[in-house]
Amino acid sequence: MRSLESFAALLAASSAAAGLSAIATEIGFPPHTVRLDPDLQSTLGLPNAVRSARLASGRGALRAILVECEHDTPLRTVATTIAQHCAAHASQLLWLLIATQYNGCDLTIATWSADRSKPRVVALHVDRTHIVPSDAETLAALAATAAESDILAHSAWLDTLGRDALSRKFYRNLQLVVANLAASATLGTTRATATERSDLALLYISRLLFLSFIQTKGWLDYDRRFLHNTFARCMERGGNYHRRTLLPLFFGTLNTPPRARASAARAFGRIPFLNGGLFARTTLERRYPQLRFPDHTLGAVFGELLSKYRFSPREESANWSEAAIDPEMLGKAFESLMEAKG
């Protein structure tokens, strides 16, 4: 039985046809594949930028298309186009698409249901240079369907690559991380209620999760791992991430126009000014000015949330859904937390 580390390595190594075949084999397809001729490629909607296209036949109606595209080919567009053509010309088959960019970074594993005029694609879309644990968990869940019948396997693919399974896992982890962060808070000589501690923990986590979306666009000093790198550097220098990094980042940088920033704030690099109120001190924070969260529980926020899941600013649409945390899913998770608190 493979470990999550080996599933992660499999995703990272899938830069060419052999790597795609290895993934398909893990999911239950035989290793033998056949090359798709140009006419069939056209029928299935494969773009001209395809370097290699092969077909694997699984149990019953299961089929996998393994596509190696040029390095700059947008795989989301490839997936939706192929899904539409397969639904139009071969709707009796149950499809899985595994596509990669030759010498590029993107990898997509997608499936769809053909029971509608325009199929809805559900997908795992990853950056092979930065595989996160939830990516490996998704591939492991797909591999667990290898012994299922064709209809049950396809149904499991739809569930695994859809948002619901990921949303449930994320919500459970979010609940646990908020509770642990709240319990670890120190407030000097002032005592806070359990509700206040929870509200403060939720506030800090909401800020960090918001920044996780911002950094995926490279808006935090052009560094898509800005938060993780600042945490690592702070630990190397003795720790105290809350006081030495989060406080000046939140209250001297993100909530301050660039021209008004002090030298310590400018040291973070090119950071946008966010004037929406999220990075303004709340009444509760002013009530507890000595609030501190220790490094070990902030580290757990990274380990159980920020580093574990893939964050995507792209929200789900009627015809596309990714196995990633998007703003809509995050909003629903916070709503559920607030309802649970009563």
Question: Can you say where each PLM-predicted feature lies in the sequence?
Answer:
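Preference for the N-terminal adenyl/adenosyl cofactor-binding alpha/beta module
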Residues: R2-S15, E26, D39-T43, A49-A53, ...
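Active-site ExK catalytic segment of metal-dependent nucleases
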Residues: A53-T81
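Short, charge-rich binding segments
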Residues: H85-H89
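Short glycine-/polar-rich loops that comprise or flank the Walker A/P-loop
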Residues: A90-L94
